[in-house]
Amino acid sequence: MKTITLTFAAALTFCASAALADPAEGRWATQPDDNGNSGIITISMCGDRLCGTLTESRNASGEVFASANAGRQIVWDMEPRGDGAYRDGQIYAPDRDQTYRARMDLAGSQLTVAGCVLFICRDQVWTRAN
């Protein structure tokens, strides 16, 4: 009986954590940067905020290559605000070697990501990757 109770509790915990996953979590394909390179950013919860790590890089020809930024956290401190809005984060742009104040907006399978300096923003639309 004790084993059944523990198994049920473990299954319930697993289901609850899966149900609480943030909608922006997962793999996202970026648009090409200024150098023509694109990538896959894997977004996950880092505490109570979202962060994203570069997990794959492709050159302008679409070939996978070993980027010096592989495994680097590209997005961090994104605060979920509800209704697909994420604010008060930071984003690193490898093509410019700069970090910007950032925001994200999720709509279906598209994630609009913007990095800003003062009131000037540069944005991309990322699409959900398999």
Regions found by a protein language model. Give the residues of each.
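Bacterial N-terminal signal peptides
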Residues: 7-15
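Sec/Tat signal peptide C-region and signal peptidase I cleavage site
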Residues: 17-21
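Central antiparallel beta-sheet cores of small beta-barrel/beta-sandwich binding domains
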Residues: 24-25, 29-100
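Short, solvent-exposed coil/turn segments at beta-strand boundaries
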Residues: 44-49, 105-111
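Short, exposed beta-strand-loop hairpins at the edges of beta-sheets
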Residues: 94, 101-104, 110-123
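Short, solvent-exposed mixed-charge patches
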Residues: 129-130
